[in-house]
């Protein structure tokens, strides 16, 4: 299955694409979408991501959740960027999973308090890359890896906690 992970940002949005076959992870592509001019930022982000989706044709998507920033304006603007990303993903009829940065770091490094260089190094190792991608692309690859691992875990609650009919 091909996954795309997205690390949304105000000026730079990272993307990472991996193929997953059982436990085998294969790097496909990664990079950033730059969306400079604030007046055109959301349109540029949407168009840039659509181009990536058309080129690599992922089957599932995952995006990092918004964290509450000290500056409410920054949080609002990041939410708008996430909206453009989700709109592009949904327009391609992709299922979209969302993960907190803490959960992604736990899945990749083993601790939710990992620093960006630690995430970069583990992404490099997990995908057997010669060098680590930049921080935005590396974070996006981490989101894709986290989502792929979570998708492989069977949903035990849906089968074990099904209410049973009472006999009379």
Curated annotation (Swiss-Prot):
The RuvA-RuvB-RuvC complex processes Holliday junction (HJ) DNA during genetic recombination and DNA repair. Endonuclease that resolves HJ intermediates. Cleaves cruciform DNA by making single-stranded nicks across the HJ at symmetrical positions within the homologous arms, yielding a 5'-phosphate and a 3'-hydroxyl group; requires a central core of homology in the junction. The consensus cleavage sequence is 5'-(A/T)TT(C/G)-3'. Cleavage occurs on the 3'-side of the TT dinucleotide at the point of strand exchange. Pfam families: RuvC. Belongs to the RuvC family. This is Crossover junction endodeoxyribonuclease RuvC. PANTHER family: CROSSOVER JUNCTION ENDODEOXYRIBONUCLEASE RUVC (PTHR30194:SF3). Keywords: Cytoplasm, DNA damage, DNA recombination, DNA repair, DNA-binding, Endonuclease, Hydrolase, Magnesium, Metal-binding, Nuclease. It is found in: Cytoplasm. Its EC number is 3.1.21.10. Binds 2 Mg(2+) ion per subunit. It is an enzyme of class 3 (hydrolase). It comes from Polynucleobacter necessarius subsp. necessarius (strain STIR1). It comes from the Bacteria. One of its GO terms (cellular component) is Holliday junction resolvase complex. One of its GO terms (molecular function) is magnesium ion binding. Mg(2+) 2 binds at residue 64.
């Amino acid at each position: 299955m091909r996954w795309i992970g997205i690390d949304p940002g105000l000026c730079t949005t990272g993307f990472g694409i991996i193929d997953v076959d059982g436990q085998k992870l294969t790097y496909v592509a990664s990079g950033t979408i730059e969306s400079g001019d604030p007046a055109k930022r959301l349109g540029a982000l949407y168009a840039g991501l659509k181009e990536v989706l058309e080129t690599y044709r992922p089957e599932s998507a995952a995006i990092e959740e918004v964290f509450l920033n000290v500056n409410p304006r920054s949080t609002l603007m990041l939410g708008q960027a996430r909206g453009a990303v989700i709109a592009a993903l949904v327009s391609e009829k992709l299922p979209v999973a969302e993960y907190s940065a803490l959960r992604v770091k736990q899945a990749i490094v083993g601790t939710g308090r990992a620093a960006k260089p630690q995430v970069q190094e583990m992404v490099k190792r997990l995908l057997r890359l010669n060098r680590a991608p930049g921080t935005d692309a590396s974070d996006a690859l981490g989101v894709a890896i986290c989502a792929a691992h979570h998708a492989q875990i069977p949903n035990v609650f849906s089968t074990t906690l099904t209410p049973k009919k009472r006999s009379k």
